């Protein structure tokens, strides 16, 4: 099957500081994170990121704290502005969008699921799930019907009139996923979406996401620091260190052929046979 690139990151750099453009040549010449901070009092967020994210696939961006993974995902909808580089969505450079077009892209093309759930406590589960449609100005009846459908799909049928504080963490995150799906966006950005959950609930949420993805074929960009989660979810895995891509590719390939000592340390404790067997079972016939 022919793949279609949905999101492209090309030569993407992010330097945090008051004069990022002036220190960019130093970074491009090879200056590292520590030297940049010591010498110029700027912080290196991303260095020369080149990633192609395919339509209908889950791209997982993984790394330790401070690796740049959350910085990366916030560039896709321009919550963070890059220092240099291109961000293409469906072939359109996001950096060239007007304020109006950027707002339209955020409303219609991308949805986001956060680690801390980001639910409005004074709104019911139904109202939270329907939020994207409310912002779009759809009739209330249409909003509620669509939100009810997705709440039922994520296992929250009957909880429409509850408030977030009445739900467990796992249930609150199901509301977050229902809200993202209700928006009917092509692209879902999931920033450490399951990291705050207990292990068993986390596994359930991973299974739910994979189950929905079989049918919906969304383009999902998923951020995590957990290798087991990354290997379970990823069609394409991108591993970051100090703001740069260390290795990327199909998860099994990275697992069997790590190209860097940093990656070798990550995968050393993984049961390769179990992971390969699980991913083989998950492949459609």
Can you name each region flagged by the protein language model?
Residues 20, 25-35, 92-93, 130, ...:
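Conserved ABC ATPase "signature" region
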Residues 77:
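Helix-to-loop junction immediately C-terminal to a conserved catalytic motif
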Residues 85-93:
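Conserved ABC transporter NBD signature motif
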Residues 123-130:
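Short coil-to-helix segment of the ABC ATPase nucleotide-binding domain corresponding to the Q-loop/switch region
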Residues 163-167, 171:
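Conserved ABC ATPase signature
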Residues 182-186:
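A short, proline-enriched helix->beta-strand linker immediately N-terminal to the Walker B motif
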Residues 243-244:
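Conserved ABC ATPase "signature" C-loop
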Residues 248-249, 257:
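ABC ATPase "signature
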């Amino acid at each position: 099957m022919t793949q279609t690139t949905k999101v492209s990151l090309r030569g993407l750099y992010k330097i945090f500081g008051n004069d990022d453009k002036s220190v960019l040549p130093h970074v491009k010449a090879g200056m590292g994170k520590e030297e940049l901070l010591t010498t110029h009092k700027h912080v290196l967020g991303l260095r020369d990121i080149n990633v192609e994210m395919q339509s209908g696939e889950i791209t997982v961006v993984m790394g330790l704290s401070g690796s740049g993974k959350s910085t990366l995902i916030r560039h896709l909808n321009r919550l963070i502005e890059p220092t240099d580089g291109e961000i293409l969505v469906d072939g359109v450079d996001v950096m060239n969008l007007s304020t109006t077009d950027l707002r339209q892209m955020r409303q219609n093309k991308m949805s986001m699921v956060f680690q801390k759930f980001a639910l409005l406590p004074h709104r019911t589960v139904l109202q939270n799930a329907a939020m994207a449609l409310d912002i779009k100005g759809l009739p209330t009846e249409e909003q509620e019907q669509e939100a009810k459908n997705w709440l039922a799909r994520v296992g929250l049928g009957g909880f429409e009139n509850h408030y977030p504080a009445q739900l467990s963490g796992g249930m609150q995150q199901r509301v977050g996923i229902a809200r993202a799906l209700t928006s009917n966006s092509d692209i879902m950005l999931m920033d450490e979406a399951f990291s705050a959950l207990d292990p068993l609930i986390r596994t359930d949420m991973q299974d739910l996401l994979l189950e929905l993805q079989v049918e919906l074929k969304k383009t999902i960009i998923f951020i995590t620091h957990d290798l087991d989660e990354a290997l379970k979810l990823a069609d394409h895995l991108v591993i970051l260190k100090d703001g740069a891509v260390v290795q990327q590719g199909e998860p099994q390939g990275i697992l069997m052929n790590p190209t860097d000592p940093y990656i070798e340390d990550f995968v050393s404790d993984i049961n390769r046979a179990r992971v390969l067997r699980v991913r083989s079972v998950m492949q459609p016939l």
